[in-house]
């Protein structure tokens, strides 16, 4: 009503559609006139939606970002994160020159040749015992360069882009169902249009408004225009689900597998009734869709059950990750089990095809380590070196363990935009280009290639632009090849072959899509769900669209629109705990406590929901607990006085 705050993740669209220019943003107001700007078409880097944008810049500085009109993707809309979240690249702490740790243990500026030689010495000595953490924000071309660098230069399949909760089951699922499939890959796969036309949609491990706003807009539009039915397996009905007219299928963490198997079975034999029965029947209608998000990887058997449900009901299955680079990283081969194009890393013919294009005799044939295993091996000394690109330690499943591994590993190379927990521990740091400063491709959740050119060109800049990740890896590989002591007998090619974007795309085209046998289906089973005792609850949570993420830094006005961080309990659990709506609730794990105001919510009992990155250093880092594990809950003053941490039971 009148006087109420305007709370929307899409508020910036009112500025763009204002016919007289009376509405402006705090970030752009009085800073430039439209005729002073150069406009460049671009693609948003903040989620897997692949939204078309227009970047307006002047004198080498981005001034504003607008939605571009793309009827097949984002139509003419853009979320506020995509519109205003570009100032992270303008922060004064941007890395502009390489850094090398000196004999006194201090990082100091170095020339590019000095830094490349230092990195080559360290990585060359660790060849065969090095791992790569590529992160989920890379373009397809950069992710491909990391995949090739790991196999050809470092001699390992120990590479993973998943800087988040992950599992072997998820890797198998991606290899079997996602790699090689998509709109621009094999002509198959779901699109925004087919999703909008679906009669029913089931969401599992996925919250559309928070994790893929463009998808949310299509679901909301389909509900309002066509009566589309959306069902969500989640602890509570989110704002996005309610605005899309959705129905909650209440699922405590870990029960998603049971729900999916029940929906796949005959509704009568499965004992479903009410909303569950209606969801099961709706999924059997032609064109129905099951959407799984990256968080389902935290649920043993969840992705396996989703695939079974899709087969049993005839529904289409689609995976929508949270970060912009994850879908492309699958195709690029930045996984321990996959080579580019969806080729299984353990398939001899797949390795031969790839080795021939890469100009090497052979490739590593063992199944590589995933992110968690790479970190563990670095901590124990099994791995002697790490190459880390754009990974935030707090995003990892075990931030404390990751910090210990980074401290313990013998040699650490970081490729980054700005100082981070990784760069402060690195032996060599290379600055790399931000999205506005390079050309590339994001592969969105549809499998649609979203190519873009650099908005900021070298001739427009007053400072030297950092190179793209792929260019840094090319220079590093060539430096390694020129270091005989490091590569003797290793078969490292004299030319890495990726000096520029055209060379990368040419290699990707030569490799094409794998036409051989697909990877085997995941066969993971569900596991017993933790049973909370007195004063305990199962932790649930997801990240909000606007939170403490590093790519949102630099715009105080955007930060001011974040939703308030609250903890959620059911009315029954709140009464058992001795708290009421608005009270401060403390949630304690093995490493510490998070305290937030309570919002009593309709949700399963003995479950506590927290926003994962909206307070402190993030829930995973501050508590040492991850969703699906047990935590202790209580009134803030009582819990703050307690010193005993709970035993964490998976």
Task: Show which residues each predicted segment covers.
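A generic structural motif
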Residues: 156-168, 226-236, 314-328, 409-422
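Short alpha-helices
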Residues: 235-236, 242-272, 302-303, 308, ...
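A glycine-rich, hydrophobic/aromatic-adjacent loop/helix-cap motif
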Residues: 289-373
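A cross-kingdom feature strongest in bacterial/archaeal respiratory oxidoreductases
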Residues: 147, 190, 197-203, 209-239, ...
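A polyampholytic, Gly/Pro-enriched intrinsically disordered region
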Residues: 175-199, 251-259, 266-275, 334-352, ...
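Glycine-rich phosphate/diphosphate-binding loops that line cofactor/substrate pockets in enzymes
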Residues: 115-130, 191-199, 275-289, 374-384
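N-terminal export/assembly segments and adjacent metallocofactor-ligating motifs
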Residues: 1-268, 568, 572-575, 595, ...
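A glycine-rich phosphate-binding loop feature that marks nucleotide/adenosyl-phosphate handling sites
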Residues: 31-38, 136-137, 166, 308, ...
